[in-house]
Amino acid sequence: MTGLAITGPAISSLRATGGGGGPSSAVNVILWVAVPYISIAIFVVGHYWRYRYDKFGWTTRSSQLYEGRLLRLGSPLFHFGILLVALGHIGGILIPESFTSAIGISETAYHAAAVTLGTIAGFCTLIGATILIYRRRTVGPVFSATTRNDKIMYVLLMATILLGLGTTVLGNLTGHPYDYRLTVAPWFRSIFYLHPDTALILKAPIGFRLHVLAAWVLFAFWPFSRLVHVFSAPLGYLTRPYIVYRSRDPQLGSRAPRRGWERVQ
């Protein structure tokens, strides 16, 4: 049976930063080993529990009836932006650098494409989320329908977006972009290999580490928010019968229908 282990380089790094079993090493193990696994467990079990016992709550709680103009502007920006961001993260984290080099994609070309598309997607997500939050705060009926969970979700979501976009933009503006595929990506993969190597994540700049921590907290909160609708798709619509709308059949007989009131003489 495969067991969870912290690799040798991680132990050496922890000793270097905290001195064996000191407070710093304990904090590093909590942040970069315990927190990811706790977040993943809550994410998986929480979604199962939510679907099993709260199917009627598995919804976006749409507020389109209350206001449509801002929603038509902010919602597409946010959803298309966050989709591109998610695909970019999946590709950048799960696909190792050795694979892209083997298929002929140079580091310069990969970095240019990742930064350009990532920045565009990030700003679309940020602008869309800002519009949706502004709408939720300023439109009375929408604000009244906003729950405490919604507010926590928006705080965590915006923190994760801002930290991620900030590390990307600031790193390139200063002329010192950081290649996260050398540290953050292999650390993330090591978590799923059940051999978390904290030495890798500790080499990353503080901005990347804060972004990662914010993401883990968001994932842990995900099952208890309206974000569960990400895993819903109206597949039943493809096979269900058409809904046919018909006007009322004309009344049979030659007698004209009587009115429901009589004139007072």
Report each predicted region and the residues it spans:
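Membrane-interface helix-loop junction between the first two transmembrane segments
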Residues: H47-Y66, R226
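A short, charged helix-loop
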Residues: D197-T198
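Alpha-helical transmembrane segments of multi-pass membrane proteins
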Residues: I40-Y53, L84-I93
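N-terminal membrane topogenic signal
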Residues: V27-A34, R69-L73
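Short, strongly hydrophobic alpha-helical membrane anchors
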Residues: M1-I30
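Alpha-helical transmembrane segments
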Residues: P36-I40, F78
